[in-house]
Regions:
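Sec-dependent bacterial lipoprotein signal peptides
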Residues: 1-18
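A Zn2+-metalloprotease active-site environment signal
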Residues: 18-271
Length: 271
C-alpha cells in the first residue's frame, strides 16, 4: 500500500513539474522553482567573479561593446515578452553582463540573467552582430529554463523511484548544489553545459530573433557558426562548441528559421 501511495505521489510530482513553454510550445520537465534556481545561480556567479579577472568597461572598448550588446539583447527580450503578454515571466531577473579575461572561446548566461563573455570568443564573433547572436543564444538557455530541465533530469535519474522523498529531503542540502554544479559546470568548466539537441536548436532560433529585434542582422548567425565550425576543425576547438550539435544540422536549422528572424530585423543606424 505504501509503495502504491509513493508511486501516486511520484506521478503527481512529475505531472506538476511538467509544463508547456509559452514561447516554444515544447513540454518541459522542471522540478525546481525558478526563484530557488536563481538564488543558486547568483551564489555560483559571485564565486566565479572572485576567482576570474573581470575586464572593466570604464576603459576598455571590448567590455563596452559587450555591455552595449548585452543591454540591447535584454531590451529586445523584454519587448518580445511584452508583445506576447508574458512579461511577468521575467520577474526576478537581475540582468548583468561581464567580460572575462580568458583565452577560452566561450559565453554563458545563468538562470536569472547573469551573462558572461570570455575575451577568447571575440576574435571568432568578430563584430557586434556576431556577438549579439552568441549572447542571444545563451540568454535563450536561461529564458527557457534549460538548466532547470537538466537538473530535473539529473534528479530523476539519481533518485529513481524515490524521486519525491529524496528530492524534497535534499533540495536544501549540499547535494542540491552538487546537482546544480553538474548542470551548469563549476570552476573552469562553468558554462560548458551539455544541453540537449532540442535545447540548442531552440537557443539558436530565438537567439536570432533577439539579435534581430536588437537591430543586428540575423544572417550573421550563419556566418558566426561557419566561423565556429571552421575553428572547430583545428587543434583548439572553441569550448563553446564542446556540447553542441553537428554543424550541418545547425546550419540547416538556422537557414530554416532565418526568414522568421528577418521579420523582426530593423537595422540600427551608425552601429
Amino acid at each position: 500500500m505504501i509503495r502504491k501511495l509513493l508511486f501516486v505521489f511520484v506521478i503527481a510530482a512529475i505531472a506538476i513539474a511538467c509544463s508547456t513553454n509559452r514561447i516554444t510550445g515544447r513540454s518541459q520537465f522542471k522540478l525546481l522553482p525558478e526563484a530557488e534556481l536563481q538564488q543558486m545561480a547568483v551564489a555560483e556567479y559571485q564565486s566565479f567573479l572572485t576567482s576570474n579577472k573581470v575586464v572593466s568597461s570604464s576603459n576598455n572598448r571590448d567590455a563596452e561593446m559587450v555591455n552595449r550588446v548585452g543591454q540591447r539583447i535584454v531590451n529586445a527580450v523584454y519587448n518580445y515578452y511584452r508583445q506576447n503578454n508574458i512579461a511577468n515571466e521575467l520577474e526576478g531577473y537581475q540582468w548583468e553582463t561581464k567580460l572575462i579575461q580568458s583565452d577560452q572561446a566561450n559565453a554563458w548566461c545563468m538562470p536569472g540573467g547573469k551573462i558572461v563573455v570570455y575575451t577568447g570568443l571575440l576574435p571568432i564573433s568578430q563584430n557586434e552582430a556576431g556577438l549579439a547572436n552568441v549572447m542571444g543564444h545563451e540568454v535563450s538557455h536561461a529564458l527557457f529554463g534549460h538548466t532547470n530541465e537538466r537538473m530535473s533530469q539529473s534528479i530523476a535519474a539519481q533518485y529513481g523511484g524515490s524521486i519525491l522523498d529524496a528530492f524534497m529531503a535534499n533540495r536544501t542540502s549540499s547535494g542540491m548544489r552538487q546537482i546544480f554544479g553538474a548542470a551548469v559546470g563549476v570552476g573552469s568548466q562553468l558554462g560548458i553545459m551539455a544541453f540537449g539537441r532540442n535545447q540548442e536548436l531552440e537557443a539558436d532560433r530565438y537567439g536570432m530573433i533577439w539579435a534581430a529585434m536588437a537591430g543586428y542582422n540575423p544572417q550573421e548567425a550563419i556566418n558566426l557558426w561557419n566561423r565556429m565550425n571552421a575553428k572547430a576543425q583545428g587543434n583548439n576547438p572553441p569550448e563553446f562548441l564542446s556540447t553542441h550539435p553537428g554543424p550541418e544540422r545547425r546550419i540547416e536549422q538556422l537557414q530554416k528559421h532565418l526568414p522568421e528572424a528577418m521579420k523582426y530585423y530593423k537595422p540600427m543606424s551608425n552601429k
